[in-house]
Amino acid sequence: TVRRMARDLRKALPNSIQVPNNQCVEFIPTKTGGRYRVEDKSGAPGTGLDFSAADTGFNMLGSNSARPADQQIADGDLIAVYNLGIAGSNAYNGDNTAAVSGTPSESGSPAETTITIASKQFPLPSGSNRFHVIPGTEKVVSYICSGGTLYRNANYAYSSSCPAPTPGTTPVIATNLDTCNFVYNGSDLQRNGLVQMTISFTNSGETVTQYHEIHVNNTP
């Protein structure tokens, strides 16, 4: 249980982890990332990502089709650039995200991938020219402890508080929970965040407590 949550959290978009209350941890997942071309060049491929005005596409350095299937950028995914998790650069609010429109195409040698997006002016460029990819089928995830059960909720409309799980519908990760506590320390760490999870299970009068610390990369 804890290991699965740790795997999920390590893939979280930088600066997207939050704990609305100690019974819930919420984050924006990512499936992959890449580097965008900064400047146009003559010939194809040659489209840089423009930060001075709304743009509808850019070139990624490298091949999309060469990636594992679950990491390939697809129609409906979201491109996120330099998420700081603050006003004006907050992926939860769509400040710095744009939806991929259509299937990315490749050309050139070495290969570059042309990614078409919904018109967007990204507020801030990445110092390392990086972007992250949020899966279109799972744009936000939360783990919620409720009524002695640990749920994994996904792809719901974002709000300032974790949504209540729907028993019988929301996927169950674990049952027989006795206590559950999530703590996140990220704002006072320059590059990394720390998620602390304490979960106790009780069954047949016996209690087992699992404690885990997960270091997450907050470099956008």
Where are these regions (language model features)?
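Extracytoplasmic beta-strand-rich oligomerization domains located immediately C-terminal to a leader/signal peptide
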Residues: 1-151
